[in-house]
C-alpha cells in the first residue's frame, strides 16, 4: 500500500508523515508546487503542473487498487474508489462505494445553492482538533488492516 495525498490544502500532512514513517509506508504528496518539500525517506514530493485538477489526474493515473488516498475532493474520491483505492477525508471520514453517491449528491446540491444565491457560502466549518483525532484513528485503522492483510500466512 502507498498513501497518495491531495496535498495542496491538506491539513493533516504532519500526521500522515508520522504514521507512515512509523509503519514504513511510502507517501506521495501531490501538489502543484505550493508546498515546501518534506525531507523524509518515506515521503515523495510530486509536483504537477498548475493546470486545473492536474494533481487529481496524477493520483488517479498512478494509484492502484488498495492504495490509500487522502483528499477532501469528492470528484477525486469517486474516481479513486472506481479504481479500487481506499479514500479518507482529512476529517477521518471514509468514503467508499456505499456512501460516495450521497457525498456527490450533497456536493451538487451545495453547488446549486451557491449558484442560486451568491450570498450562500456553505457551512464554513473549520477544521478542529476533533477532526484531526478522528483522522488519526481512521488512518491507524486502515494501516493496521493493511499490515494484517499483507503478512505472509
What are these regions, as identified by a protein language model?
Residues 2-153:
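Nuclease catalytic cores that cleave nucleic-acid phosphodiester bonds
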